[in-house]
Each structure stands twice: as structure tokens, then as C-alpha cells.
Amino acid sequence: MGLGARCVVPEANNSNKEIKINPNIIKESIQMVKYASSKNKVYLAILGISWFWFIGAAIMAQIPSLTRDTLGADENVANLFLAVFSIGVGLGSFGCSYIFNNKITTKYVFIAALGISFFGIDLYFASHIASINYAPEQLKSISQFLSKSHYWRILFDLFCLAAVGGLYVVPLFAVMQYFTSPAYRSRVIAANNLINSFFMAGSTVILSLLFYM
């Protein structure tokens, strides 16, 4: 699918033919981040995107534990959660072009962030209520899981959280690229990916410390 999508992406021209490749990866990475941080709107967008990946990494990491230890369900239910989350992000991202009418705007980013918080909190309470019926001697299958109405609330929260996440992050990506000079755009995107990875790693470290405590 990725290769197929690549084939229909319009070819981009070289915006800076005089660019020199620095073989020192660390030094060049620092320079890319410095340049990105010097552009206020761009850097704020990158931080917002990184926060999205921070939360996303935390949620994805907790799904196996949530499924088995809290809800008492098997790995097929965990796969269902992952599928629902992925579909939600995809639909939310796809819906941006219709909701924003193909305009670059952060008008609803704050509302989407509130939506992530709301559905995240409700997911916690829904999971807590559902855990009351946890039977440790037998893990629930998908059919058993879907047969109870209170489990559908968990799926709904997870889907909506992912969907508003898509509505949140896509406008920030658009802002990051729009306010970056074409000559630096690819390097700013690389800097964004680097900062994203640090946030995701930080999410993993924090979760590990909380688990240890």
C-alpha cells in the first residue's frame, strides 16, 4: 500500500540545488532542530505534533495491558482495539479536508485537543467500570467482549479519541509545511520526525517508571 501510494505522489522539484550534505549526522541534526526552533509558528506546530505522538505512543503501549490485565480479554480484542484506533485516526485525518474546506487553519486544534482529553478521561472511567466484571480464570473472546454494552463504550471512546487526534494533528502538519521555505521544508520535516521520536521515547520512559513505581 505504501509503495502504491508513493507512485501517485506528485514529483517535487529540487528547491535548493546548492545544498551541501554534512556527513556529521549529529551536528546536522542539531542544526536542523535549531533552524526549526527559530521559526515560531513552525516550532509550535512541531511541539503540538510531538505531543500527539507522545499521547499516541502511551495509548498504544497500554493497549495490551489494558486488554488483558484490566478487561480480562484475549489478544484478539487487543487487535480489535488497535484496528479501531487506526481507523479512527485515518477517518479523522481524512475528514480534515472536508471540515476545513482545504484551508490551512488551526481554528479547531484547541477543540480537538480538548476532545482528546475528554475521550481519554472517559476511556479511563469506562475501563474502570468494565474491570468490575473481570474474570481472571478465563480471557474474553471478541464475541464475548462485544456482547456486553459497557464494552462498546470503550470502543466508542477509543475511536473518538483517535478521530479527534487526526483532526488535531493534520492541521499542524499543514502549518509546519506551509510556513517553511521550500528550500528548508524537507529538513524541517526531518527535524520534526527527530523531535517526535524524542517525545515518544520520553513517553516510554515515563510509563516504565510509573510501572516500576
Regions found by a protein language model. Give the residues of each.
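C-terminal membrane-cytosol helix-exit motif in multi-pass small-molecule transporters
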Residues: 1-15, 123-127
